[in-house]
């Protein structure tokens, strides 16, 4: 992705200032950025915060979205797209988009737009189903070891889905979806479990996350 420098893009520090807290599911390889003085100056320049640390009207609107994302009952990450239900409107979601320079953009979108944005961003979801793809096929230990020992060049398109549910006891789930040797796999890192699947299962799972009607939750069934 190209670098972005428009005023409707924000650094991680700017968003944490506006939200008053860290952003769920937004992680960094080494440590969280912490240049808050520069972030505050940027917010003042964008006329979102005053010199006296007060939110302007425009700043209040952006801060409301950030705080909605932080306080949502569930956060969903699909690679560099972060979602949370918008509590004020049914079927609306907050979308936090992350760019390669760790710039972010935040907005509200309908769940239909959310789905098509995901599909357009990650062509893996338009994969043509293969005759050797399964609904769910457990990979035995020997096959898994052979796959793990193969060159990284055998791995094609990759998608990560991460879910953080705040209801009751907080629960966090991570799924790695990837192509290898012309097959599609889903890996549950926390359970060290790998399944051969077809893309329809993955698409159904994602659509269920956004409240689309489906027959059953395939991914949850596979984890049982």
Curated annotation (Swiss-Prot):
**Subunit:** Interacts with EssD. Interacts with EssG. Interacts with EssC.
What is the protein name stated in its UniProt record? Type VII secretion system protein EsaE
| InterPro entries referenced in this protein's UniProt entry, alphabetically | EsaE
Q: Which domain of life is it from?
A: Bacteria
Record's subcellular location: Secreted
Q: Which GO terms describe its cellular component?
A: extracellular region
Q: What does this protein do?
A: Component of the type VII secretion system (Ess). Plays a role in Esx protein secretion. Plays an essential role in the processing and secretion of EssD.
- The answer on whether this UniProt entry bears the keyword Secreted reads yes
Decide whether keyword Secreted is in the record: yes
The alphabetical list of record keywords is: Secreted, Virulence
The coding gene here is: essE
């Amino acid at each position: 992705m190209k670098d972005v420098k428009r005023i409707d893009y924000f650094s991680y520090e700017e968003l944490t200032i506006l939200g008053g807290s860290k952003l769920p599911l937004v992680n960094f390889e080494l440590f969280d950025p912490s240049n808050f003085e520069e972030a505050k100056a940027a917010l003042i320049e964008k006329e979102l915060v005053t010199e006296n640390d007060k939110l302007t009207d425009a700043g209040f609107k952006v801060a409301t979205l950030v705080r909605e994302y932080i306080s949502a009952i569930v956060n969903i990450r699909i690679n560099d797209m972060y979602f949370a239900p918008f509590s004020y409107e049914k079927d609306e979601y907050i979308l936090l988009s992350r760019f390669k320079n760790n710039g972010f953009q935040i907005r509200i979108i309908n769940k239909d737009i959310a789905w098509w944005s995901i599909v357009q961003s990650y062509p893996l979801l338009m994969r043509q189903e293969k005759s050797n793809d399964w609904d769910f096929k457990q990979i035995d230990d020997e096959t898994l070891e052979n796959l793990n020992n193969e060159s990284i060049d055998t791995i094609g398109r990759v998608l990560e889905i991460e879910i953080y549910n705040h209801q009751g006891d907080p629960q966090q789930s991570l799924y790695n979806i990837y192509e290898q040797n012309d097959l599609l796999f889903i890996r549950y890192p926390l359970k060290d479990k790998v399944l051969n699947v077809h893309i329809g299962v993955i698409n159904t799972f994602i659509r269920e996350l956004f409240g689309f009607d489906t027959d059953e939750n395939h991914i949850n069934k596979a984890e049982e």
